[in-house]
């Protein structure tokens, strides 16, 4: 890490999260923007990264060449798409640098590819990079463990903006995994994603998901534990994308001196022992 701070690459630089990352890196001591990458053919390629993020010129031109961007970098922050993130994971592994992945909608097969890349890269991957959500996941696991499945039903409700393309959200699935871990069950077997028509009575021990989409909602998540005559709700509301950008930058700096491996935000925040 140089005297000006950890050299970070932002991929997906033209998107909402990419622009938020550029702004926050510019404001955060201990890190610096090394390069910014947008997809080939993007109208933003060749433009100044600071200008598109509302900072004014900062002297870093957006490129569509990740190989060149990763050269001499120390970390990459990635909120793109599953296929694109897997490509970047391979490049990060070749470069032996940190790769922070906030991309959602990844399949189990995608996860295996990330883990393979982590043999050479320090990969931090999470469905949500915020401190609050990761604390919520720990509390969800503890509550699921304490409240027995026969008497307490778990439902996970999430809402996001109308442009989000995957459902349930990565955060909802993260919370579902936490609930399943507390109950010592497999989420794939226990989850109920769709209810329509005559569904019959709710099966004890299942973990339900409900998805809402609309407007400009950044992210709202609630885990509901419903018992006879009482209900416990654990909720998180995101008011600004900067919470995810801030968490991703924190993760990159944390991973700088770590061994190659596959890490989560619980590791970054020192909460993994609570799993």
Swiss-Prot record:
Gene this chain is encoded by: dapB
Full protein name: 4-hydroxy-tetrahydrodipicolinate reductase
Compartments in which it is found: Cytoplasm
Enzyme class: oxidoreductase
Phylogenetic classification of the source organism: Bacteria, Pseudomonadati, Pseudomonadota, Alphaproteobacteria, Hyphomicrobiales
Origin species: Agrobacterium fabrum (strain C58 / ATCC 33970)
HAMAP family per UniProt: DapB (MF_00102)
Binding of NAD(+), residues: 12-17, 102-104, 126-129
Molecular-function GO term, any one: NAD binding
Enzyme Commission (EC) number: 1.17.1.8
UniProt pathway annotation: Amino-acid biosynthesis; L-lysine biosynthesis via DAP pathway; (S)-tetrahydrodipicolinate from L-aspartate: step 4/4
One cellular component (GO) term of this entry: cytoplasm
Reactions mediated catalytically: (S)-2,3,4,5-tetrahydrodipicolinate + NAD(+) + H2O = (2S,4S)-4-hydroxy-2,3,4,5-tetrahydrodipicolinate + NADH + H(+); (S)-2,3,4,5-tetrahydrodipicolinate + NADP(+) + H2O = (2S,4S)-4-hydroxy-2,3,4,5-tetrahydrodipicolinate + NADPH + H(+)
Xref: CDD domains: DHDPR_N (cd02274)
Role description: Catalyzes the conversion of 4-hydroxy-tetrahydrodipicolinate (HTPA) to tetrahydrodipicolinate.
């Amino acid at each position: 890490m140089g005297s000006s701070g950890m050299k970070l690459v932002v991929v997906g630089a033209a998107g909402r999260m990419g622009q938020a990352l550029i702004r926050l890196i510019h404001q955060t001591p201990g890190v610096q923007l090394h390069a910014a990458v947008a997809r080939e053919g993007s109208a933003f390629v060749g433009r100044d990264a600071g200008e598109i993020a509302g900072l004014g010129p900062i002297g870093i031109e957006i490129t569509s060449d990740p190989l060149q961007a990763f050269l001499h970098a120390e970390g990459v922050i990635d909120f793109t798409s599953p296929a694109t993130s897997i490509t970047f994971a391979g490049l990060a592994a070749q470069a032996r640098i940190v790769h922070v992945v906030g991309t959602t909608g990844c399949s189990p097969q995608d996860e295996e590819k990330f883990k393979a890349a982590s043999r050479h890269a320090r990969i931090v991957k999470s469905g949500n990079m915020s401190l609050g959500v990761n604390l919520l996941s720990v509390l969800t696991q503890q509550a699921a463990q304490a409240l027995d499945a026969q008497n307490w039903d778990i439902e996970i409700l999430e809402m996001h903006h109308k442009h989000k393309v995957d459902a349930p959200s990565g955060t909802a699935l993260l919370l579902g995994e936490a609930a399943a871990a507390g109950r010592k069950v497999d989420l794939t077997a226990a989850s109920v994603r769709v209810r329509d028509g005559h569904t019959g009575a709710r099966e004890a021990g299942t973990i339900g998901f409900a998805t809402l989409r609309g407007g400009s909602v950044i992210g709202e998540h609630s885990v509901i534990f419903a018992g006879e005559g009482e209900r416990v709700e654990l909720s998180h509301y995101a008011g600004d994308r900067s919470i995810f950008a801030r968490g991703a930058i924190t993760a990159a700096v944390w991973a700088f001196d770590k061994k190659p491996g596959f890490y989560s935000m619980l590791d970054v925040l020192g909460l993994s022992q609570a799993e």
